[in-house]
Amino acid sequence: MKLPVRLPVFFGIAPLGLLLGLADPRVSPPVRPSLNVHLPKLAFGSSGMLRVVTANPDERLNLPVSVEGVGPGEVLYRWLPLYGTRSVLPITEFPLASGIMAPSEPGIWRLRLRAGSIREEIKDLTVVVRVPFAAKQGGEINGYRIGRYGTEGRIRFDAYSPPMGFIEVTPGNEDMQLSEHLRLRQFVTKNQREIWPKYVALDLRLIDKLELVMQELNAMGIPARRMAVMSGFRTPDYNGPGEGGRATLSRHTYGDAADVWVDNDGNGYMDDLNGDGRVDANDAAVMRIAADRVEARYPELIGGNGVYASTPEHGPFIHIDVRGKRSRW
């Protein structure tokens, strides 16, 4: 008698998956080849916490990127737009050996390298290309009021020459990290809330210094996990002339000053940094000690430092800037 042919019956997900032509989950996927890219420490600031580099259009970047095991002439780079940055430029690759030039268009960009068929995006660092100062016409850029700088139209090369340009801020990029603990939206002028895009002058040395102050506080045994920014960049239009015209030279209008406090619990007020059970100007004075220590260690970040007491409108805070010379009040 001829016995019937019995087909094997498979039980379990894996064998059935193989019958259906699906990948076996027990087998690891192939490893994607990557480039061993090295970024210089200077790209992340003295704090090691910066996450962006700012540049003017077509500016040569001081960013000596190297790729281990690959000759410089074998690596090409191109720019990828981020956060809704619009580009009309053709997709072009450039030789890394010739140095890295910033994109020709303002916006937020990421660097991508390619060696043969292997591609690698540099995700640790974002390049922000400023809108040139010359784009400001009649005190505005795209309907956003900036105003006029007191030194505008004069030939100056000091800390009071107008900023080189402005970062364009949109609803899509305002939450971008500038550093480990600070975001772009924290430094936007507090008026014209309904107008987009907005524009911010920003000196990354300030961001680096604020991160270093947080590090110093932690080294002093004072927890500093979160920094609130009451005021960062202020447009000249918003800041006004002040008494006797003094505010026309405010460091806030140049993008290298901020009024800040440590706010670990996120309640909107300075924390009790000195542990005396009160929140007052003495806590801001603790931050001054940390800022003084940072300046002693990093003289290139020297600047102003002012302690402010509480008012009915706000709690105590400290002003920190990187104007290039020591000033205290």
Task: Label each residue range with its predicted role.
Residues 1-6:
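Positively charged n-region of N-terminal signal peptides that target proteins for export
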Residues 137-169:
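Compositionally biased low-complexity segments at domain edges in trafficked proteins
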Residues 209-244:
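Extended, low-complexity, intrinsically disordered C-terminal regulatory tails
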Residues 8-21:
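Hydrophobic membrane-insertion alpha-helices, especially the h-region
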Residues 118, 218-223, 299-300:
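Secondary-structure boundary elements
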Residues 248-329:
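Catalytic cores and adjacent binding grooves of peptidoglycan-active enzymes
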Residues 25-137:
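Beta-strand-enriched, solvent-exposed domains that form extended recognition/catalytic surfaces
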Residues 163-223:
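Active-site acidic/histidine clusters and adjacent loop/turn architecture
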